[in-house]
Amino acid sequence: MPDLAQTQHFPFVCEGGLISNRSTFIMRAGEALQLENFEPDVEGGYRRIDGFKRHVRSIVPHTSSTEESVLLTTFFDNKIIAARGEKIWSSASTDLGRASINKITAGETMSGSGVVTVKNTTGFSSSGSFVIDSEEFSYTGKTTTTFTGVTRSTNSTSAAAHAATGTNRTVVSETWTVRDTGRTNAGKYSFERFNYDGNDKIVLVDGTNAPVVLNTSLATTDISESAIAGASIVASYREHMFYAGMSGTPQELVFSVPFDEDSFTSGQGAGSVKVDDTIVGLKVFRDALFIFCQNRIFKLTGSSSANFAVTPVTRDIGCINGKTIQEFAGDLIFLGPDGLRTVAGTQNIGDVNIGTISSNVQSIFDDNILDSSVFESVVIPEKTQYRLFFTKTSGLESRTEGIICVLKPQQSGQPAYEFSKIKGIKPACTDSFIEQGNILILHGGFDGYIYRQEE
């Protein structure tokens, strides 16, 4: 037996995250050499990430090819809004009631008089169809928590048993309803939720067609202004709607009159500004509209067209892709040419500091920035977590990589950014939304389905 008389316990805290830029000889105790599909936990240590599952059971219908990826997924007015091919669709999603009395047996007969109990029916049509697992049901009415007049095994599907438990939810989702058509050659969408007149709306842009506005009835209205046709970027600032990313005027930012996303009369407060670089993203932060370009960053300040002013933040650093820009932990975070960076406001009003934060995992960025065709990001506020996905269109989902960034308190008392690696999630588009205190982290897949992360 070895003599252990001189040995001592050496307690340490798992903190510091994944480190790929330092020798193991100088790494601190608790830092990780490998940290894949684990996340730094704001409550301490590292934990395995939660997975993802279909949030809408049926596939988003394609236009001309099953190879079409999902171009948009977002949450608006209790509906899931998605785009694929040339069309925009809506659905709704809830959970099967978790009590044992709410289970559905395979032999249970439902021929127009069945009742299915769910968590809630908010967002579902007053009558229509829904899907549980692979079985489709029709219904003729609903209450706040039940579908009534239910017929099962519709649309050539087979009856099956369905149940939910306290730890495992069973998704109940509405079949897709088309809301807009004819969006020829649409690219990936950007969107902005807003309320200028007491009515919630969402404006969608796709880089090719006219911007389109949806109201809470999901009726669509195209914005026909020629100056913003083909916009791919949109943001609301000071009650003006700003549009950018037009292929013919990539350096121009066009804004509407106040409180009207569809009016561009210059004498009533509309106008445009130009910068000397191609715009890739817009983000409102600390009373300014930040304009991210390929090689520069600007900010627009002011309260109206009379005093809007554009000033440079930096002329030396740009943003690789506008889909990486997020408000995170009191800063704006974005993907620069050398990794993740923040636009951090200091104590001096108007002073801005640009800093890189991802040097600990620089090799992962070096391996992925140049050959990734799609970049997507989400923020999980309750975890103070930012996720960035590097997607190669032809690559396998199982080989798709990403980065988790967490701002986490350290033993020193100061917060620090910690990182880990994601593998096996391949989003074509993303969105995060807080719904009645619940955080929805959605992504649309290259396979045509809508998924919810953190499942």
Regions found by a protein language model. Give the residues of each.
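Beta-sheet-dominated scaffold domains
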Residues: 195, 239-240, 248, 275-455
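Hydrophobic or amphipathic alpha-helical targeting/insertion segments
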Residues: 190-226
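A short beta-strand motif characteristic of beta-propeller blades
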Residues: 55-64, 175-183, 219-225, 266-273, ...
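Secondary-structure transition/turn motif
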Residues: 84, 92-93, 118-122, 149-158, ...
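Beta-strand initiation motifs
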Residues: 96-99, 114, 146, 173-178, ...
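Small/polar beta-strand repeat architecture
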Residues: 99-114, 119-188, 223
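N-terminal beta-propeller domains
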Residues: 1-99, 213, 229-298, 373-407, ...
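Short strand-coil-strand connectors
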Residues: 77, 85, 131-133, 207, ...
